[in-house]
Regions:
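Structured, active/binding-site neighborhoods that engage oxygen-rich ligands
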Residues: 1-122
């Protein structure tokens, strides 16, 4: 892995760990209830799914294998693969639905929900 990729992933993980406790909170609410304590080594689905993607690419000679990638994502959801505490958390509704579809045998190209409400973050 090149230094650029490694540095990018480390930056993502650090930013994710620092931002995760404040996720979904407004600046206004943080004025009255600031994040004062943070658990060490905790990151969200953003870092875990990035690590899954990199593991898949690395194991497949840096070629994208959608089935391998989805298997790793499903392993993350079901078993906490590449999570800090062995459990997936902070999963978005669209991501969860797509992975559940995959686990239930829906063809890969049909796993993602297809309506305008599923185009957001998560």
């Amino acid at each position: 892995m090149t230094d650029y990729i490694l540095n990018g992933v480390l930056g993502l993980a650090v930013g994710d760990a620092l931002g995760q406790p404040a996720q979904g909170k407004t600046r206004e609410s943080l004025k009255f209830s600031p994040v004062l304590e943070m658990r060490q080594g905790l990151w969200s689905d953003d870092t875990s799914l990035t690590l899954c993607t990199l593991a898949s690419l690395r194991e497949n000679d840096w070629r994208l294998d959608y089935h391998d990638l989805l298997r790793r994502f499903a392993k993350w959801l079901e078993y906490g693969y590449l999570t800090p505490e062995g459990v997936a958390f902070d999963i978005g509704a669209t991501t969860k639905q797509a992975l559940l579809n995959y686990l239930n045998g829906v063809p890969l190209e049909c796993c993602a929900p297809r309506n305008e409400w599923n185009c957001g973050n998560g």
